[in-house]
A protein has these predicted regions:
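Thiamine diphosphate
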Residues: 108, 117, 122-123, 318-321, ...
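N-terminal alpha/beta PP-like core and its mobile active-site loop of ThDP/TPP-dependent enzymes
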Residues: 2-344, 381, 385-388, 461, ...
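Generic enzyme active-site microenvironment
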Residues: 167, 310, 393, 446-447
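Active-site-proximal structural scaffolding
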Residues: 237, 277, 375, 455, ...
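Glycine- and charged-residue-rich phosphate/anionic-cofactor binding loop of Rossmann-like
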Residues: 139-142, 369, 517
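Active-site diphosphate/adenylate-binding microenvironment
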Residues: 16-20, 24, 28-29, 42-46, ...
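Phosphate/pyrophosphate-binding active-site segments
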Residues: 2-10, 145, 305, 309-398, ...
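Glycine-rich phosphate/pyrophosphate-binding beta-alpha loops
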Residues: 36-39, 85, 102, 292, ...
Length: 570
């Protein structure tokens, strides 16, 4: 270790103390984690840092999903800590979830000491190599003197350009090395570029295409939300009079009560949104990556479009899935701000009338019941009682799609869901992180009975810390989305979908110290939900729903967007 002298403005401290001070310097409000042998110096240093808030989850995957929910709902960088070996590998699914959805995280993992690296030491795992395809960048810290710079760089990389997870792997001996601490305050990264400034020529070409179009449509994706550009999009839409369809992650990026909103498009998109894309002469994708759940059959996507324009912060997305005629690279907020200085109304009067007919002819609908609880009814009820103002997290499955369809999102960062990876077990821990980051907002976690059993242990956190998340479990005693696909695409050959052996969720909640409620018929549904809203602490509400209820509309794999199964007489 280097011999150093300290100046009056410096302190001689350990790598663990350097880490905690660096996190505080970056404005970190809370860290989610789980201790183990190779991070014990870090956890020991926390004892002497009363300002450092740490929440002990019950599984490392719960920690990273909570950090993810915190990041998505606040726009800040989420942070989690785990030990080496199984602690680090338990984070892999959460890292991939964040990477697919461009979520800024800094993940701190311990590792074995440098003198035994490569010897298959106890709890040794090469987490850098394991996670290389699913991180924006990774660091192995071999010298404590590099740690202040690495922490500062990690936060900068995670939260600039196309955002994403950055991993810092710290061997145990490095966490106990000492150095004269000086906080890093500059970033020098050769070859790394954040977001380029908008190119006026690119934007002018897009505005000219808008002037020539008669049936334009905007596809607004998660990039609109992550760029904090909702207001710029609203202004652009109201000026140009171009209708908007949103992706799953784009929900809330444009208000659902705006007359120019068509709804969600894609695999379970609404009729008007899907038909708008299939009949448009100009597609303008803003912060959407044209993934397969949006385009469906690729060679049948937007067949009448004369031009496809793509606005994105990441040049690698341009032309990756869909041939792009016009590209605008840059931070979406800045791109739209520039566009708004020159935008004019498009000639969309007749087009908007046609789209309104689509909305009237084929609105979202379902067959309600006077007795059983339909899941769509539950989501409508939650939407109405919260007036679209809550932060909603979902797990993955049918309930995720019902939420996307029937909850009316008015604001960005109000829907927290795993889009690209489709991670079961994500929704409830993400709700904990969202509530920690937004203590004054109502947070509702929508789960299926399958996904809830992948993360139920995190109810302990809600009870201990009194984190008042409203936990909703839609219990149909089956893996519903798998069942629906087996019904429609595998000739009803149902295989390994029965969840009838699940626990009593109310008793499970009570065992963790959380209030539990259940509704088994429609008369009980609104009563228990209102009771849940009036409960000051965390509460779980189980709604027993039919096993055979499916999500519609649905576009089958290998078919174009306009070939929807509507689920009712067409």
């Amino acid at each position: 270790m280097t011999n150093e002298t300290t100046t009056p403005s410096e302190e001689y401290i350990t790598g663990s103390e350097v880490l905690l001070r660096g996190l505080l310097q970056e404005g970190v409000e809370c860290v989610f984690g789980y201790p183990g042998g190779n991070v014990l110096y870090i956890y020991d240093a926390m004892v002497h840092q009363p300002d450092f808030k740490h929440i002990l989850t019950r599984h490392e995957q719960g920690a990273i999903h909570a950090a993810d929910g915190y990041a998505r709902s606040t726009g800040k960088v989420g942070v989690c800590i785990a030990t080496s070996g199984p602690g680090a590998t338990n984070l892999v699914t959460g890292i991939a979830t964040a990477y697919m959805d461009s979520v800024p995280l800094v993940i701190i993992t311990g590792n074995v000491s440098t003198n035994v690296m490569g010897t298959d030491a106890f709890q040794e795992a090469d987490i850098i190599s394991i996670t290389m395809p699913i991180t924006k960048h990774s660091y192995m810290v071999r010298d404590v003197h590099d740690l202040p710079r690495i922490i500062h760089e990690a936060f900068y990389i995670a939260n600039t350009g196309r955002k994403g997870p950055v991993l810092i792997d710290i061997p145990k001996d490095v966490t106990n090395q000492r150095m004269a601490y000086r906080p890093a305050d500059t970033v020098r990264l050769r070859g790394y570029h954040g977001a380029p400034e908008p190119n006026p020529a690119e934007m002018d070409a897009l505005l000219q295409a808008i002037a020539e179009a008669r049936k334009p449509v905007i596809i607004a994706g998660g990039g609109v939300v992550y760029a904090n550009s909702s207001q710029e999009l609203i202004k652009f839409v109201h000026t140009t009079r171009i209708p908007v369809a949103t992706t799953l992650l784009g929900l809330g990026g444009f208000p659902s009560d705006d007359e120019m909103w068509l709804g969600m498009l894609g695999h379970h998109g609404v009729y008007a949104a899907n038909m708008a894309v299939q009949n448009a002469d100009l597609i303008i994708s803003i912060g959407s990556r044209f993934d397969d759940r949006v385009t469906m059959k690729l060679d049948g996507f937007a067949p009448l479009a004369k031009r496809i324009a793509h606005i994105d912060i990441d040049p690698a997305e341009i032309g990756k899935n869909v041939k792009t005629d016009l590209a605008c690279i840059g931070d979406i907020k800045n791109v739209l701000a520039y566009a708004n200085t020159k935008a004019q109304a498009a000639q969309t009067g007749t087009w908007l009338e046609q789209l309104q007919e689509y909305k009237v002819q084929h609105p979202l609908r379902y067959t309600d019941s006077d007795t059983v609880i339909k899941p769509q009814y539950v989501l409508e009820m939650i939407s109405e009682t919260t007036q679209g103002e809550a932060i909603i997290t979902t797990d993955v499955g049918q309930h995720q799609m019902w939420t996307a369809q029937f909850y009316r999102f008015k604001h960005p960062r109000s829907l927290i869901t795993s889009g690209g990876l489709g991670t079961m077990g994500f929704g409830f821990p993400a709700a904990i992180g969202a509530k920690v980051g937004n203590p004054d907002r109502l947070v509702v976690s929508i789960n299926g009975d399958g996904g809830m059993q992948m993360c139920a242990q995190e109810m302990a956190i809600c009870a201990i810390h009194q984190i008042p998340v409203k936990i909703v479990v839609l219990n149909n005693q089956v893996l519903g989305m798998v069942k629906q696909q087996q019904e429609l695409m595998y000739e009803r050959r149902y295989s390994q979908i029965d969840l009838s052996g699940s626990p009593d969720f109310v008793k499970l909640a009570e065992a963790y110290g959380i209030k539990g409620l259940r509704a088994t018929n429609k008369d009980e549904a609104s009563k228990v939900w209102l009771e849940a809203l009036q409960t000051t602490g965390p509460v779980l509400v189980e709604f027993v729903i039919p096993t055979n209820e499916n999500v519609y509309p649905m576009v089958l794999a290998g078919t174009p967007l306009d070939q929807m199964i509507l689920g009712y007489d067409e």
